[in-house]
A protein has these predicted regions:
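Glycine/proline-rich, positively charged
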Residues: 90-153
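Structural detector of well-ordered beta-strand residues that form the stable sheet scaffold
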Residues: 51, 80-81, 148-153
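Active-site mouth loops of central-metabolism enzymes
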Residues: 20-34, 83-93, 125-127
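Acidic-and-aromatic substrate-binding clefts and catalytic sites of carbohydrate-active enzymes
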Residues: 54-63, 87-93, 122-123
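N-terminal binding-site loop/beta-alpha segment at the start of enzyme catalytic domains
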Residues: 1-78, 137, 143
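Secondary-structure boundary/capping residues
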Residues: 75-79, 89, 111
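Active-site beta-loop-alpha junctions enriched in small/polar residues
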Residues: 19-21, 54-56, 83-87, 116-119, ...
Length: 153
């Protein structure tokens, strides 16, 4: 595996995304957990240490399976990315609740990378709107150590 140094961290140049995990009977919400866990094991054992997921992948179940898979490895041995679901305007008032649920689903105390998801002209005002406090809250989580790197996708 080829690695890149990112601010003192060794990150694999190839990562594993969870937007399209194997499913049962074509049902996007019904992840074939055994097959997915095999994929995680294969990736990890072959040096992949960057894993990317998001709130909405597989109707919310990708974070659960990712958490289950990665909980079997030492937390400091991989880099975990997830995202705030800004593609749905109804999520903005729930930033604290969603963030807490993501920590729980992913069975972690912190995220290496946390991204404002799908930033575009449709939702940029909501991300920056002080009434929702999304930016402010996530910056405070970074200061508290629950987010190492904050960005956008």
């Amino acid at each position: 595996m080829i690695y890149t140094d990112f601010q003192g961290e060794k990150i694999s140049q190839l990562g594993m995304g969870t937007m399209r995990l194997p499913v049962v009977d074509g049902d996007n919400a019904n992840i074939d957990e055994a097959a997915a866990l095999e994929m995680f094991d294969y990736a990890y054992k072959h040096g992949i240490n960057y894993f990317d997921t998001a709130w909405g992948y597989h109707d919310g179940n990708a974070e659960l399976v990712t958490g289950k898979a990665l909980s079997r490895y030492p937390r400091e041995s991989f880099h975990l990315t997830t995202k705030f679901p800004g593609y749905d305007r109804n999520h903005f008032p729930k930033v604290k609740e969603i963030f807490a649920k993501q920590l729980e689903k992913l069975q972690t105390e912190y995220f290496d990378f946390y991204l404002f998801h799908n930033v575009c002209e449709y939702n940029i005002e909501n991300y920056l709107n002080p009434a929702f406090g999304v930016k402010e809250y996530l910056v405070s989580e970074r200061a508290a150590g629950r987010i190492k790197h904050l960005g956008y996708s």
